[in-house]
Every structure is written in structure tokens, then in C-alpha cells.
Amino acid sequence: QVARIHAVGVLVVDEIQHLNRARGTGKEDLLNFLVTLVNTIGIPVILIGTLGAVRTLTGDFRQARRASGLGSMVWERLSRADGWDYFVTRMWRYQWTQEHTPLTEEILECLYDESQGIIDVVIKLFMLAQMQVIQLRRGRGRPETLDAKLFRHIAKENFKLISPMINALKRGDREAIIKYDDI
């Protein structure tokens, strides 16, 4: 009733993978609550989480059936062959530098290598690189251009915490990747 009174069109539950850490009956109780909610609320309920959520949501058929509702989608990292060039080309339009740098094959390859197709990582890499060249121009009079060397430097300096995960993806090390269930 509260959802209808306030004209809620959709309920989004984000970070559902954190249920994996729930102790005791807390996890089961919350999953049962979500199933009941989906059955009674009368509006779409969207559950969002990393791949770590799959273990939780597919624990038994009832939860898997409810979690998939009208369908489920797993959004994985982009492969170099499938959608990467399209995505980066569209992102590349959002250059805020004074000098527009053309997108080259070398830059495309570098961005993929440093992000391994993870959209969040490549966006942050693109943003941080632009911030750096804009600051360097103001401080040292350098041109505001982007290149592969800059992107590699930015990744090395700013992505130290995620470098083990990125390196595991680069190597195709399945055992290491499994340890990081939220990639």
C-alpha cells in the first residue's frame, strides 16, 4: 500500500551481493522477505549486485525463480571483439581537453589492456587522464593531449588496489579470478 500511495514505479535493491556475508538466519530471512515483497508489492523489484550475488540468489529454486522474475541479465566486461570499440568511441566524445586527441588503435588497445573491458574502470581511467593533462597544462604549460603512455601511467599510479584483479583477468587465471567474486 505504501508503494501505491507514494506512486513508486519500481523498487531497486542494490549491492545484493552483501547478503553473502550475513550470519545466521539473517540471509534467509531477508531473501524470504524479498520473495514475499515481490509477490505482494505489485511493482517491479530489480535486484542489482556483482557476480557474487549469483551464489546467494541461486541457492534454491524458489529464490532463483523469484530473482529472475521477468528475466535476468548478467552484465559482464566487454570483450575486445564485442562492443569495446563502439563503447570507447562513444565515450571518447566526452573529452574536456582544449586539444581534441583522435582515438587511435594504440589508445583503444591500451585502454582495454588497463581496464580489461570493465566499463567502470575505463571511464575512471579516461576521466583521471583528462584531469591530469588539464592540471599539467595549467601548472607547466604542457599540451592537453591524451596518449597510451599517459593512460598506462595513470593506471599504474591510481589503480594499485585493483591491479591484482586486472592482472588476473589479463592472465586468464581462473583461480585468481574466482577469489574476486565482485569483478
Which role does the model predict for each range below?
Residues 14-16:
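Walker B catalytic acidic pair
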Residues 25-28, 113:
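Short, solvent-exposed segments of well-ordered alpha helices
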Residues 77-183:
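C-terminal alpha-helical "lid" subdomain
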Residues 27-34, 144-148:
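Amphipathic alpha-helical segments in well-structured domains
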Residues 2, 7-9, 18-23, 30-106:
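The catalytic "switch" region of P-loop NTPases
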